[in-house]
């Protein structure tokens, strides 16, 4: 026992402990300072090396007992293992080089550490705070075994150490104290052996070299691996990353979890607990420390087998067979028959055509002299190296070039003679008396004359006299050539690519409709017209199946179907948000329908407003009464939502509302001078704005801001002032048949569609002619529409396409409108040469609705 203690003492001295720090408080009663729990970095590294040797030794000793293998593996450890003095020769040699003063400090500390419990009790209160600080500075990882303190014995350290200590320090009193402390330690070990029984010597070797650790006020963390869960994915609880973990040696925590809370280091086991665990735990030899969490991880059988195979120099993969049977992939036997016995192709026996062409090109180059033979090449090279001859008395061409006129401009040719200079000109070229008097009056100002001579007529060429002005004209010609400067006119050649205007990219002009989103199906015949509610929640459609349908925009669900009794050619939702009303042009009737969708109070208010007809004080004239009648609604139509019926004497093509929602106009193209009717809803009156017909009227449109009415005939568009009752201007689209038109929300630009595949953009402040013509469609254009908020307009054509374009109108009157085609949407199907009929934009969103001959309405977003 004493020998083992002295060995531990010498190993502690050889570890070269650090001098006490400022945090260590001086001991009372004149004792030396308290040694910290943890040793220096050098001792810690020595301990790690011994621990690895311990693990490898236990792995190699498969047949031995776990406790025995631990005892053998710990022989190189810092703890006292037994009386095997010969195995510690390396440590004895290191102990001979140790310093004497360090041994004195260690022995003194050991004596003080073995003091009575009363003294320890008195010091515990004073040093409790100091121990906590020491834990922060010197505590190591959780799974790392605790390094023992300086061994307190030195009396029987070995055959070589004791004589040296006695010879060096014979008069030192500290040596006596060290011997006394060793004797006390032997007494403690004897008492412990008596308690543990006959096997105590085997199980408690080196217990006395580990003083008990003081208990701190910290709670122990539960072992993460108590349940045997060693999943790699669940072990990553410390979020500090791949950093050196010794940075946390001075702190109570080892990192942070996923919630940002500190991971507190679990307290270290004292020496006795660790020794008991080493002796009793069968898995102690396969337990390693996780540096991230500080917990102990028990290696599985697969991990231990992997380590054994690596140490034995074998393949780490257990399934790999080093002695697999040899498979001869490529045989060494010579085959008698060929594996691939395909006959040669015919082209392998024929001369190559590509080589024939190359030879032909070389022969042609030789004939043309492009390819020189070797003799010709040498002859030309010798001639180039030989002397060069030139004319000695040859003129200097450089000076002559300087005297010449550079960039000579050819003299203009004289104009050829005309019919008036003929000797027998036509009679109309001869002067009459008035023209002759006028020519003679410019005698003093000859430059004002159209001709510088008087045309004359002779019967034959023999009668032509001598021309008296010949010499003078030659002289003037010479003066012109001599004195008049000449100049070149540079003709600017402009390519066609420069004539195309540079338009911005469509990506910079978003948002605009690009894809089909919803399809509204339900009609059984082609849908000619559509209109949307001012709030954008509901859509009304009119079809040739003699019904109108009201749809919910967001879900494409048909809410209501109302029969009209005839083909529906036009529908228009009232723009006034205070009433809920739809105007429908069906055959010769105009129906005002309350759809009863949306706000119930709004629908009730509309019914109350249209319940009673106002009394007319003025009787309508016969011209109006024979053309239009406001009649009562039948009971069946009243239940369907029809509130007012207006009968016309001709078929109605279009119905459109004024911006305020009180006036609406209807168009009857076959009614001649009574084609346009303007109706007032509040007074239930109708009137003809025009007394004469200026052509076959196609459609009308109210100005969004001013009291103006746009009337489109087949070839012209007239703008009338309804207040002054006069014609403001007449627009000339230069087309043969106008189909529809739409006005910009600001009212300064008009878009006209024709059946001739063209669209015309009119700037009303600029000219009566089109500002720009757009030829984007391949068939007749049925309808056009502007967006109320975004700079967008769209057109629908019989080529089943709907084209969305960008139309920006600037507030600056000096800047023209920017028109850029954006997207062609071809989703409708063609039926009987009909494609898309009508288009309308959503009032607030950049969405587009289109109706077609395929009985569908499509929403583009």
UniProtKB/Swiss-Prot annotation:
Keywords associated with the record: Nucleus, Repeat, Ribosome biogenesis, rRNA processing, WD repeat
Ranges of Acidic residues composition bias in the record: 62-77, 87-143
Basic and acidic residues composition bias: residue spans: 144-156, 174-190, 212-223
Pfam families (alphabetical): BOP1NT, WD40
WD repeat ranges, renumbered to this chain: 522-561, 563-603, 692-730, 733-772, 776-815, 831-861
Keyword hit for Nucleus: yes
Keyword Thylakoid tagged: no
Location of the region described as Disordered in the Swiss-Prot/TrEMBL record: 1-237
Predominant place of localization: nucleus
A Gene Ontology BP annotation from the UniProt entry: maturation of 5.8S rRNA from tricistronic rRNA transcript (SSU-rRNA, 5.8S rRNA, LSU-rRNA)
Coiled-coil parts of chain: none
Domain of life: Eukaryota
Record's subcellular location: Nucleus, Nucleolus; Nucleus, Nucleoplasm
MF term (GO), any: ribonucleoprotein complex binding
One GO CC term, this protein: PeBoW complex
Start-end of Polar residues biased regions: 29-45
Similarity comment: family membership: Belongs to the WD repeat BOP1/ERB1 family.
HAMAP family named among the record's database cross-references: BOP1 (MF_03027)
Function: Required for maturation of ribosomal RNAs and formation of the large ribosomal subunit.
Protein name: Ribosome biogenesis protein BOP1 homolog
Species annotation: Culex quinquefasciatus
